Amino acid sequence: MKMDSAVSEEAFERLTAKLKARVGGEIYSSWFGRLKLDDISKSIVRLSVPTAFLRSWINNHYSELLTELWQEENPQILKVEVVVRGVSRVVRSAAPAETCDNAEAKPAVTPREKMVFPVGQSFGGQSLGEKRGSAVVAESAAATDAVLGSPLDPRYTFDTFVDGASNRVALAAARTIAEAGSSAVRFNPLFIHASVGLGKTHLLQAIAAAALQRQEKARVVYLTAEYFMWRFATAIRDNNALSFKEQLRDIDLLVIDDMQFLQGKSIQHEFCHLLNTLLDSAKQVVVAADRAPSELESLDVRVRSRLQGGVALEVAAPDYEMRLEMLRRRLASAQCEDASLDIGEEILAHVARTVTGSGRELEGAFNQLLFRQSFEPNISIDRVDELLGHLTRAGEPKRIRIEEIQRIVARHYNVSKQDLLSNRRTRTIVKPRQVAMYLAKMMTPRSLPEIGRRFGGRDHTTVLHAVRKIEDLVGADTKLAQELELLKRLINDQAA
């Protein structure tokens, strides 16, 4: 039974007074100052806040306290919900970063329907913190039937992907595959590798989504390696392995994410058969991992060989312009939920300059700003540095990746990165390889055995020989010394 509006407001006022007494004035103004009563119906109270961040924080830290206080007002209350004001509980599809999606929200999919899109945190789309159980309606029945594997996130599209020098080649290859359809196979298999938080999953899901959108009855499967292992183990347990394998072989496009997690001899054996079947049948395969195929030491050598037979592209860390664009898009998305939100361009630019890691670190920095902005609206750059010290690591050595050293050295000497990892012993390859090993030892905290593994599985004594060789030469070879200084500067600039 619905409470009278005046009675509801009186109850809410009493509750907020109790809440303020329990948590203190400062915490109350920080977290609950913009809390409003939306509705009291039957046994449920619905409260609202202006941002998803506030909603997530209150739900995670104060849900039990709110329920307890409401039950003191009305023992029939069983549940307190906190929602974002003016936003339907149905998740919107991703919209361009500069505009807000004002279209009427569609009803949520019921549990019986197939197309469910879990939502996490990302730039360029729906706001952070949406629960992974949320759902949107599939655009078509064909799309519903097509995705047989892991769920897709509707925000991960090519339109919401921030491109730049570090990922432009991988993005172009991904678009080509998505647009080619089943009639033409390109770069097969396409292997995209990068460290965590640099957009691999976004790119792979964008391929799957675009392929489904382009071709009405496309048979597209997007899987994480862990999900593949679970599905296959379940199929064996249920005596359904043959049917599962046949289902996967009868597709147009297979997209596999997080290949580094594919474990188990029998599982890898079955995946190898699947990979061979699809490639031999001219079916497109796209794979992503956190390292190059040659460095996936836990994978069966036959799987690695097949993956190396295609095109491998690396996605590097975003540069300053990309980081700034990510922050701008994230702010535009947040402003769709709270129009009063305002973070100055100079603050965004400063964060883009100082937080130089992955997109996830940038997301963490923005979340800090979003949180602080609710009770520090005029935050200064000095205060930003203080808040983000754990991300910027001011005064600490820059984090330099061996893969970046290899890429920059290979480009400088006009050889391929694969040449550096190969067994070729020509002079044009040996010198760049030794230089790259030397720089890896000088500029990273990695051990000699670890560096050796990153250079095609070489022994640590090979790395030690390379380091000593360059040290011996640099004293007498002015040109080499200048090359090393230039390379160090290029590597440091990339890490900046």
UniProtKB/Swiss-Prot annotation:
Residues 374-496 are annotated as: Domain IV, binds dsDNA. It is found in: Cytoplasm. It comes from the Bacteria. Residues 76-150 are annotated as: Domain II. ATP binds at G197, G199, K200, T201. Residues 1-76 are annotated as: Domain I, interacts with DnaA modulators. Keywords: ATP-binding, Cytoplasm, DNA replication, DNA-binding, Lipid-binding, Nucleotide-binding. GO terms for biological process: DNA replication initiation; regulation of DNA replication. Pfam families: Bac_DnaA, Bac_DnaA_C, DnaA_N. Residues 151-373 are annotated as: Domain III, AAA+ region. GO terms for cellular component: cytoplasm; plasma membrane. Plays an essential role in the initiation and regulation of chromosomal replication. ATP-DnaA binds to the origin of replication (oriC) to initiate formation of the DNA replication initiation complex once per cell cycle. Binds the DnaA box (a 9 base pair repeat at the origin) and separates the double-stranded (ds)DNA. Forms a right-handed helical filament on oriC DNA; dsDNA binds to the exterior of the filament while single-stranded (ss)DNA is stabiized in the filament's interior. Belongs to the DnaA family. Oligomerizes as a right-handed, spiral filament on DNA at oriC. This is Chromosomal replication initiator protein DnaA. It comes from Brucella suis biovar 1 (strain 1330).
